Amino acid sequence: MMRTLLCATLCALLIAPLFAGLPDPVKSRFVVGDAVWREIPIRDDLQGQYEKCWQTAINAILESNFAVATMDKESGYLRTTENAGVVTLKGDWVYNVQVSIKFTYIPATSGQQASVQKIRIQASGHLAKVSKGRLKEAFQGYDSVVLQNVFQDLQAKLGPR
């Protein structure tokens, strides 16, 4: 018990400086570190309908107020532009979020249609403080709220029931 408490306290003390500089509006949603990918297996009745899955993913991104920067239907990859309107910060802080989607599928061959296995989602973000044209602080990571919202939307539309 004491060891667990000591470990938790030590971890909190070591991690606290990482988040000390974050503005309050993003502290609960921005995770500093490498952006993570979340996966959704495509439900059985949609696995043979790559076109429908692809269009559903595009619509979900657009409905989440992101604009498409690049997409390649053949490779199953879509990335949005950076969205600075997810959270509006005051002062010298700038916060941008970008969503990426990647389908895992077996392409169509002669006599067989494409088969979609899963969709992967990522919501990377960066947070920067710029003062008088100079970068003062910068953080890389991901937005857990955007990731969860897009994940839940696509899970409901494409995932197992």
Which stretches of residues belong to each language-model region?
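Positively charged n-region of N-terminal signal peptides that target proteins for export
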Residues: 1-5
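Bacterial N-terminal signal peptides
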Residues: 7-17
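Ser/Thr-rich, low-complexity intrinsically disordered terminal regions
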Residues: 21-161
